[in-house]
Amino acid sequence: MITDILAMNLQVVFCGINPGLSTAHHGYHFANPNNRFWKVIHQAGFTERLLTPAEEQHLLDTGCGITMLVERPTVEATELGRDELLQGGNAIVEKMTRYQPRALAVLGKQAFSQAFGIKKVSWGRQERRIGETQVWVLPNPSGLNRATLESLVASYQELHQALQDNV
């Protein structure tokens, strides 16, 4: 069972779509060796060193957390139903209202669109807020995403810099 890594007043909560089978098997977020999440957040400046999935609880020490839209593991996120994503969006709103991080970073444009019922979504900071929490949409670091490591890091650095600048 994959559990949220959450605490009050974090800098950012990264919101994955759902666990892949490798993640579900290992019991840690972003555990598939092809997933670039841990490398990306390190290179973007969120962690001082490269963490392994087994060290996910150390994220709290850096002001970061992790949650997911849907808890059901699948091979690909495309296997998720629309209702599952909408329910996930509602659950995320409840969690963010409760924990009040400075930012929520949803990892995937299509997942964000479906979970929050927003048709046109751009990358980066969104107009929508959840209470005082800024909402961002960042590219998914999955190995299935063709984005380069450099472009992923640049997107995540934009969020990191905005948080550093108190924007």
Swiss-Prot record:
Excises ethenocytosine and uracil, which can arise by alkylation or deamination of cytosine, respectively, from the corresponding mispairs with guanine in ds-DNA. It is capable of hydrolyzing the carbon-nitrogen bond between the sugar-phosphate backbone of the DNA and the mispaired base. The complementary strand guanine functions in substrate recognition. Required for DNA damage lesion repair in stationary-phase cells. It comes from Pectobacterium atrosepticum (strain SCRI 1043 / ATCC BAA-672) (Erwinia carotovora subsp. atroseptica). Its main location: cytoplasm. One of its GO terms (biological process) is base-excision repair, AP site formation. Binds DNA as a monomer. It comes from the Bacteria. One of its GO terms (molecular function) is pyrimidine-specific mismatch base pair DNA N-glycosylase activity. InterPro entries: MUG/TDG, MUG_bact, Uracil-DNA_glycosylase-like, Uracil-DNA_glycosylase-like_sf. Keywords: Cytoplasm, DNA damage, DNA excision, DNA repair, DNA-binding, Hydrolase. GO terms for cellular component: cytoplasm. Pfam families: UDG (PF03167). The gene is mug. Disulfide bonds: none annotated. It is an enzyme of class 3 (hydrolase). This is G/U mismatch-specific DNA glycosylase. The lineage of its organism: Bacteria, Pseudomonadati, Pseudomonadota, Gammaproteobacteria, Enterobacterales. It catalyses: Specifically hydrolyzes mismatched double-stranded DNA and polynucleotides, releasing free uracil.
